[in-house]
Amino acid sequence: MANLGLPYLSIEFREQGIARIERSKRSVVALVLQDPEVSGEFQLFSLSDIPKGLTDKNKAQITLAFMGYVHTPRKIELVVEQSDNADKPKFDVTSPGFVYLESVRWDYLAVPFADAEDTLEIATWVKSLNTTKRKMCKFVAANVKGDNKKIINFTNKTMRDLTGKEYGTAEYTSRIAGLIAGTPPQISCTYAPLPELAYVEPISM
């Protein structure tokens, strides 16, 4: 009779293992934006969760992130900082939004409107999170030297979608973060198709 409790434990461990496998198939994207009207931290599980009042430019970034690949991202940890200069945003890793990201789980970060200076600062911050905070996270950065496996360096200069809209390197990091987050661990995203694009400027080798 003493062994009656063992099957329950076996089922519980098995269920936990299945849950971990399912989570690994769909990672979490962290996305940091600035907006003239909206501010706060939001957990998005689908496009229907996009906060009201965001600019069309910011909504487009969330849409890009949710495109994913085999799967969509499990969720997006969205940080929106209110700024009167949202058209030319500046980001500070000591701001409340970035402090919030230190306290929640996410896998891939994109800050699509960060300039070169802020991108370097954010890259340093992400490296620090992995070493001092023991977080398992990566930063999809635009044109940052790939000197650390926690930094994913995206360098394509110009992308044009089927409607004719063009994206610069940094603007498209949301799409890349979502694509990687939606890639199951048993396959590679190296040759993942981007069906929304009509043109990608070739990289000079």
Stretches found by the model and what they are:
Residues 24-27, 75, 135-139:
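Positively charged, low-complexity intrinsically disordered regions
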Residues 1, 81-83, 116, 158:
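Interface-prone segments of viral and bacterial extracellular assemblies
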Residues 21-38:
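A short, compositionally biased N-terminal segment around positions ~18-40 that is enriched
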Residues 35-111, 119:
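An N-terminal, globular interaction/scaffold subdomain
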Residues 1-26:
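Short, intrinsically disordered N-terminal pre-domain segments
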Residues 32-35, 89, 100-205:
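A glycine- and small-residue-enriched flexible loop/hinge signal that marks low-structured segments
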